[in-house]
Amino acid sequence: MGVTQRQLMDAYIRQKRASPGMVQASDLQMSRPMSGMRSNSRELHGYDGPMQFIGSPHNPDQILSNNSTTGVHLTSSLNSSRNNSNNLRSLSTINQEDLIEEISSHELEDDESSPVTVVEQPIQPQSANSMQSQRLRSGQQSFNEPLDEDDYANRNISGVAAVRPANIASPYKDSAAVEGSNGTANGSGSIGGNGESEGDVIGNIDQFVMQPAPQGVLYKCRITRDRKGMDRGLFPIYYLHLERDYGKKIFLLGGRKRKKSKTSNYIVSCDPTDLSRNADGFCGKLRSNVFGTSFTVFDSGNKESTENPRLDLAVIIYDTNILGFKGPRNMTVILPGMTEDDQRVKISSADPKQQGILDLWKMKNMDNIVELHNKTPVWNDETQSYVLNFHGRVTQASVKNFQLVHDSDPEYIVMQFGRTSEDVFTMDYRYPLCAMQAFAIALSSFDGKIACE
C-alpha cells in the first residue's frame, strides 16, 4: 500500500518531536529528575564491527553463529529491504505538486526555531494595587517540546525556539502569586491577579468583541482548531470561546484563512456559521505581507467609505533573522493609543489624510500608538530549553507560546497565548486589548513565515 501525503507529514512531525529546541512552560514538573538520566551504573554495549562474532558470550551485541538464528535475521533484513523498496516506489508515484502544496499550506513549526516550555514558578504574593493603564507584567516559559502540525508549517522560520512552561524561581521580587485552586492569583501582574475579576460578556457579542477590556478585568479564553474544514484540513477553522465556571464556555469569534489570496488573509466573524466578508457577523480581518513577517488587523469598516472608514486595530511584526541563530521567536505588537475614557484612538491607513499604525511606528511617532513586545523566555540548563511561567494556563512547549508586555512594566502581562494539546490553545488578555485584537494576534502566530526570527 502506497504512502499517503498525510502519513509523510505524520512521520516528519514524529521525527521533529524527538528533537530538542522548543519553548516550554515553566509551570510543569519534570517526569523524572535529570540526575537519574546521567547515571553511569549500567553497562553499555555498542560495538557492531566485524569482530563481534568472537565477542564474549555475555555480550548482548554478539552475533551468534547459529544457522537458524542467522536465517531469521537475514529473512527479516530482506523483508525490511523489500518494504523500503516498495515505499520508495510508492513515494515516487505521489504527485509532487500536491505534496508541496499540502506541506506548504500546513501551519507548522520551523526547524530552527526553539519552542518555549512551560514551568510553574513559586512567586511571592504582592499587595493589591490599583490597575494602571500602561502597566504590563509577565512570567516565565521554556523551549523543549514536540512540534504540532502548524509548528511544522513554520519550519522555514529561521532561528526560532519553542517556549516551555517552566518551574523555576521568579526573577522578580514583586511578582504575583501563582493562581490557586480557584483559578485566581494573588498578584495584579500575573494572570488572575489580586483584586482582578474574570471578565464576562456584556451586551451583544459583536459589540463586546470590539470593546477594550476594562482595567482590572482578565478574560480567560480558549482557541480550538478544527481541521475538518475544507481542502483536506489545509485551511482549518479557529474558534475563540470565553471560559466560564464548571467547564462552560461562550462563543466569541471564529476565523479562517482565505484560500485564493496572494498573502495570508484571515476573515474573523462572530457568526460561527458564516465566516465570510459579507456575513452580518463580520468583525474584521488579519492580512500579512508576502513574507508573513508583518500582519495588520483591520475592523469591518469600508476603506472606500468616509462615513464608516476601515480602522487599523493592530500591527504584528515578527523579527527576521537571516543569520539563522537559534532562539525564541521575537514579536512586536503596535496598538492604537487609549483616550482618557479608555477608548481606542481612531487610526486609519485607508484615510489619505492620516498615517496608519505601521507608518506611525516606522516614523517613531509614538503619540497615538502603544508598542508591546513578547516577554523574553529564560534559558533553563536543567531542561535545556527556554521557559516562561504561564501560571498553569499553558502545558505544552511550542514556538507559538508567548506573553506580551510593555517595556515600562514587564511584570504586567497584557496577553498570553500557548498550547495545551494538539488543537487546543489558551488565550488570556486584559486592558487595553479587545477580543478581536487578541484573537488576531493569536491567529498570526499560527501562520507560516519565511526568514523569521
Swiss-Prot record:
Modification type Phosphoserine: residues: S142
Residue spans of biased composition, Polar residues class: 62-73, 125-144
Major location (coarse): cytoplasm
Bias type Low complexity, positions: 74-90, 179-188
Cellular compartments annotated: Cytoplasm; Nucleus; Cell projection, Cilium membrane; Cell projection, Rhabdomere
PROSITE patterns: TUB_1, TUB_2
Region ranges (Disordered): 19-39, 58-90, 125-148, 175-194
Alphabetical keyword list: Cell membrane, Cell projection, Cytoplasm, Membrane, Nucleus, Phosphoprotein
Keyword Disulfide bond: no
Membrane topology category: Peripheral membrane protein
GO terms for biological process, alphabetical: protein localization to cilium
Membrane in keyword set: yes
UniProt cross-references to Pfam families, sorted A to Z: Tub
GO cellular component, one term: nucleus
Family: Belongs to the TUB family.
Protein name per the record: Protein king tubby
Organism, scientific name: Drosophila mojavensis (Fruit fly)
